[in-house]
């Protein structure tokens, strides 16, 4: 992993990709650690009753994948201070995710 510094970053730079395919086992482990038992994340039956085709991943699990993308990109000394996310659809175990980002703002803090 290369270390990225603010001087190396320009508006419009691409980040990624990080390609993932979350599994049901990962979802079950995540919801267990998170401490939730919300049906749409744990039960196909409940998820279907809410209009989904099966269980879905919680938004914070999706955001964790994006955090993984960004912290892997910026290196050990990098700091992720804010992450803005637009959720466009639900994600289910087995979906192939192509996580990418675009630098839209640069703010130097502490100088």
Show where each model-derived region lies.
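Residue-level structural signal for beta-strand termini and adjacent loop
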Residues: 20-21, 67, 109
């Amino acid at each position: 992993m290369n270390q990225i510094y603010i001087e190396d970053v320009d508006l419009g730079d691409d980040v990624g990709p990080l390609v993932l395919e979350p599994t049901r086992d990962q979802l079950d482990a995540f919801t267990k650690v998170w401490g939730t038992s919300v049906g749409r994340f744990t039960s196909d039956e409940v998820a279907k009753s809410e209009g989904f085709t099966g269980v879905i991943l919680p938004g914070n699990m999706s955001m964790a994948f994006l955090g993984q993308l960004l912290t892997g990109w910026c290196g050990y000394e990098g700091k992720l201070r804010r992450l803005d996310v637009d959720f466009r659809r639900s994600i289910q175990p087995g979906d192939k995710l192509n996580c990418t980002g675009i630098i839209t703002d640069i703010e130097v803090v502490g100088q």
